[in-house]
From Swiss-Prot, chain A:
The gene is AGL62. Signal peptide: none annotated. It comes from Arabidopsis thaliana (Mouse-ear cress). This is Agamous-like MADS-box protein AGL62. GO terms for biological process: endosperm development; positive regulation of transcription by RNA polymerase II; regulation of auxin polar transport. It comes from the Eukaryota.
Curated annotation (Swiss-Prot), chain B:
It is found in: Nucleus. Residues 89-114 form a coiled coil. Its main location: nucleus. InterPro entries: MADS-box/MEF2_TF, SRF-like_MADS-box, TF_MADSbox, TF_MADSbox_sf. Plants lacking AGL80 (mutant fem111) have defects in central cell and endosperm development. This is Agamous-like MADS-box protein AGL80. Keywords: Coiled coil, DNA-binding, Nucleus, Transcription, Transcription regulation. Residues 1-61 form the MADS-box domain. GO terms for biological process: positive regulation of transcription by RNA polymerase II.
């Protein structure tokens, strides 16, 4: 049976001849083997030691509680596990707790990864649907002609200016003199629309209303950080756990009298978010600073 | 085939735990056997059960003795170099999965921003409620695309195109969705080209740095050492990713004069459009083109109505990351 890919097909149980394939197979299967061993320890409380010499004669080993203790027990033909002392009991209990938290965290990350992959596939479908409209500027850049590229380039530069001006609105407090330029922003808006009609005051008011909606939207994002209880003691969990519950937030009703107050809140929200991001990174670094073999607390 | 995912926790039911142990122990032994056979290597496994004082071993007692002896004769450093316990192994897996998740999120974000960029190009910017993070990412995306377009333009200009072909393609372009007046109006002045060039230089440098980091991370480093090194790579990638997007905008913010100048340019271009329209001799044809654009925009809006929900959801996640 000839198949194009190597997914889900049986292979001969003999030594592989291709050297690079052999190396890749060893790496993948060793990892899977250790994974199965780890699961067995977690589910059934077994003690395991696995020693593997790679094709390059390097040695890989996995053990629970650790390789040396299990090997010692085997060599000495000792039927009793060395857990008779109280200290050993306490250490075992704490290790189990740490392993349980690590397992929970791993399950959570893998679940999020699954969700993110589905999202990526959805976005791909949307892109396919948009491309089907037949707009030439969405073709790969290599397939466009020179004049098309130059026109496209001009439009992209215009769009970049619009994005920059829109972004500067969020920092009006930092660049107050730029607020005067909002009338020119309407001109830019007109150009991008492709129409040459001067926008009237109604259009200007609509844009201001959209900006206010954006403020409300941001305002919703910041509150859950403080309102939600901590997600366990896991530093990762605090960051990851916020995400699923975030979607239940509601948008407060728009009140024109609070326009200025919300503008001020906007600036504060930005500052808080930036500091929050830095804290996230700091926590991330701090966690990974632990050496892997350390017996110290995980938290 | 299991019908549902097994929860990774100690099985409290005694009989269920015993059955699971029996099945999984057998599977584990089988996997050691397959690995040893396929790669022609030396391996052994020792499994102690809570219910039995005698261990299960592979391949045999004497086989394990031989492998263990070989293992123990290695220098101490070599023995522990790639040794992991369950705690260390789980941490490695978490780090690996976290990096994969981060990369997947980045890919999703780029795909989303590409869609938003093309929608904005045909005048649908209002349907997305873009916040500062979205605008920052969108600006970065536009800059990347501009870099590709500029590179392609240089290639075509260097190869040289016949005048006839240019003329015919120009006609084709005018038949497209962007009418000729816009093409004329959007020709960028020299100063703007220079600015875009400088930005592209920065982006090019950033791109040059990133592949090295990814290669370093993907290199099959030593297991023990890898866990020490991976966090640094992860942090470096995170910081650089953050810095790239942030610096794009900060560069613009640090030059408010340029922003004011660009705003004036936009106004000037707008007046230029008016001037061009005044000379135009076929207003009806122009009206027809505008109508075509509106129809196309409406079609795009209908087909993309799902985007706001997706965008909001992704934005929420990106916000906390």
């Amino acid at each position: 049976m000839v198949k194009k890919s190597k997914g889900r097909q049986k292979i001969e149980m003999v030594k592989m001849k291709n050297e690079s394939n052999l190396q890749v197979t060893f790496s993948k299967r060793r990892s899977g083997l250790f994974k199965k061993a780890s699961e067995l320890c977690t589910l059934c409380g077994a003690e395991v030691a696995i020693v593997v010499f790679s094709p390059g004669r390097k040695v890989f080993s996995f053990g629970h509680p650790n390789v040396d203790s299990v090997i010692d027990r085997f060599i000495n033909n000792n039927p009793l596990p060395p857990h008779q002392h109280n200290n050993m009991q306490l250490r075992e209990t704490r290790r189990n707790s740490i392993v349980q938290d690590l397992n929970n965290h791993l399950t959570q990350v893998l679940s999020q990864l699954e969700t993110e992959k589905k999202k990526y596939d959805e976005l791909k479908k949307i892109r396919e649907k948009t491309k089907a409209l037949g707009n030439w500027w969405e073709d790969p850049v290599e397939e466009l002609a020179l004049s098309q590229l130059e026109g496209f380039k001009g439009n992209l530069e215009n769009l970049k200016k619009v994005v920059t001006v829109e972004a500067s609105r969020f920092f009006q407090a930092n660049v107050p003199n730029f607020y005067v330029g909002s009338s020119s922003n309407n001109a830019a808006f007109g150009i991008d629309d492709g129409s040459h009609i001067n926008p009237d005051m109604d259009l200007f008011s609509q844009r201001r209303m959209m900006d206010i909606n954006a403020f409300n939207y941001n305002q919703n994002q910041i509150h859950p950080n403080h309102a939600l209880p901590p997600f366990g003691n896991n530093a990762y969990g605090i960051n990851e756990g916020f995400v699923p519950e975030y979607n239940v937030n509601f948008r407060p009703e728009y009140n024109p009298n609070q326009n200025q107050i919300q503008n001020q809140n906007q600036v504060q929200i930005q500052i808080q978010n930036q500091s929050f991001k830095r804290e996230n990174i700091s926590e991330y670094e701090h966690h990974h600073g632990y050496p892997p073999q350390s017996r110290s607390d995980y938290y | 085939m299991t019908r549902k995912k097994v929860k990774l926790a100690y099985i409290s039911n005694d009989s269920s735990r015993k059955a699971t142990f029996k099945k999984r122990k057998k599977g584990l032994m089988k996997k050691v056997h397959e690995l040893s056979t396929l790669c022609g290597i030396t391996a052994c496994a020792i499994i102690y059960s809570p219910y039995d004082t005698n261990p299960e071993v592979w391949p045999s007692n004497s086989g394990v003795q031989r492998v263990v002896s070989e293992f123990r004769t290695l220098p101490e450093m070599d023995q522990h170099k790639k040794m992991v316990d369950q705690e260390g192994f789980l941490k490695q897996r978490i780090a690996k999965a976290t990096e994969t998740l981060r990369r997947q999120r980045k890919d999703s974000r780029e795909l989303e921003m590409t869609e938003v960029m093309f929608q904005c190009l045909i005048g649908n910017m209002e349907m997305f409620h873009l916040n500062i993070v979205d605008l920052n990412d969108l600006g970065y995306m536009i800059e990347q695309y501009l870099k590709d377009v500029n590179r392609r333009i240089e290639i075509l200009r260097n190869s040289g195109t016949e005048i006839g072909e240019s003329s015919s393609v120009a006609v084709a372009a005018s038949e497209g969705n962007i009418p000729m007046p816009n093409l004329v109006a959007t020709t960028a002045p020299t100063t703007t080209i220079y600015e875009v060039g400088s930005s592209s230089s920065f982006a090019a440098v950033a791109n040059f740095v990133n592949p090295i980091d990814l290669q370093q991370f993907r290199h099959p480093a030593a297991q023990h050492v890898g866990l020490n090194e991976q966090p640094q790579n992860l942090n470096l990638n995170l910081n650089q990713n953050y810095n790239q997007n942030q610096e794009w905008f900060m560069e613009m913010m640090n030059h408010p004069e340029q922003m004011r100048y660009q705003t004036e340019q936009m106004g000037y271009q707008f007046m230029d459009d008016n001037h061009h329209n005044h000379i135009h001799h076929q207003p009806q044809e122009h009206q027809h083109q505008i109508h075509d654009e509106s129809s196309n925009a409406l079609d795009a809006a209908n087909s993309s109505s799902i985007i706001p929900v997706t965008s909001s959801s992704i934005t929420n996640k990106t916000w906390f990351h």
